[in-house]
């Protein structure tokens, strides 16, 4: 077998798309103290107990959008590694310019 990727008779294949895995329990990894710390950084003094589930959903939606755009930039550049610049450009595209990471 010759060097390179793929086995016998694989030939050239287009870019692989990553499957979108959805793990329901992973969103619970954002703990109440973590949400509380984020709120404190934003200047919140008291937090209602109903906020935690809503903030998890908002954070999940925000991160899905940013990651989707960053992966799109990565795939367009024919790379397999998402760089910090991909994330910076994804945030800039959504109107949330992030300074300090180049670009």
Swiss-Prot record:
Functional description taken from the UniProt entry: Core component of nucleosome. Nucleosomes wrap and compact DNA into chromatin, limiting DNA accessibility to the cellular machineries which require DNA as a template. Histones thereby play a central role in transcription regulation, DNA repair, DNA replication and chromosomal stability. DNA accessibility is regulated via a complex set of post-translational modifications of histones, also called histone code, and nucleosome remodeling.
GO molecular function: DNA binding; protein heterodimerization activity; structural constituent of chromatin
UniProt keyword list: Acetylation, Chromosome, DNA-binding, Nucleosome core, Nucleus
Protein name in UniProt: Histone H4
Annotation: DNA-binding region: 16-21
Record's signal peptide: none
Name of the gene: HHF1
Database matches in InterPro entries: CENP-T/H4_C, Histone-fold, Histone_H4, Histone_H4_CS
Compartments reported by the entry: Nucleus; Chromosome
GO cellular component terms, A-Z: nucleosome; nucleus
Keyword rRNA-binding: no
SUPFAM superfamilies: Histone-fold (SSF47113)
Sequence segments annotated as region (Disordered): 1-29
Record organism: Tetrahymena thermophila (strain SB210)
Record field: compositional bias (Gly residues): 1-12
UniProt keyword annotation of DNA-binding present: yes
Family, per entry: Belongs to the histone H4 family.
Assembly, per entry: The nucleosome is a histone octamer containing two molecules each of H2A, H2B, H3 and H4 assembled in one H3-H4 heterotetramer and two H2A-H2B heterodimers. The octamer wraps approximately 147 bp of DNA.
Post-translational modification as stated in the protein's UniProt record: The N-terminus is not acetylated.
N6-acetyllysine carried by residues: 5, 8, 12, 16
Start-end of Basic residues biased regions: 14-23
Cross-referenced PANTHER family: HISTONE H4
């Amino acid at each position: 077998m010759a060097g390179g990727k793929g086995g016998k008779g694989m030939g050239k294949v287009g870019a692989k798309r990553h499957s979108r895995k959805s793990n329901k329990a992973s969103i619970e990894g954002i703990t109440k103290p973590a949400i509380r710390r984020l709120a404190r950084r934003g200047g919140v003094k008291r937090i209602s107990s109903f906020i935690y589930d809503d903030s998890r959903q908002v954070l999940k939606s925000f991160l899905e959008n940013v990651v989707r755009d960053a992966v799109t930039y990565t795939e367009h550049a024919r790379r397999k590694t998402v760089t910090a610049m991909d994330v910076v450009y994804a945030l800039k595209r959504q109107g949330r310019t992030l300074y300090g990471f180049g670009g």
